[in-house]
Amino acid sequence: ESAPAPEVSGDAVFSAIQNGXLKNLGNAFFW
């Protein structure tokens, strides 16, 4: 609980791009 999972980093970022408005930012980063 105290220590964050290593997968959370990538998963959270991807989730934020998919659910957030960071789609433009994600596009520039992933594409």
Curated annotation (Swiss-Prot):
Record keyword Secreted present: yes
Keyword presence, Chaperone: no
Main subcellular localisation: secreted
Localization (cell): Secreted
GO biological process annotation, one example: killing of cells of another organism
Cellular component GO terms held in the UniProt record: extracellular region
Keywords for the protein's UniProt record, in alphabetical order: Antimicrobial, Fungicide, Secreted
Role: Antifungal activity against C.albicans ATCC 76615.
Protein's UniProt name: Antifungal protein 1
Organism for this UniProt entry: Musca domestica (House fly)
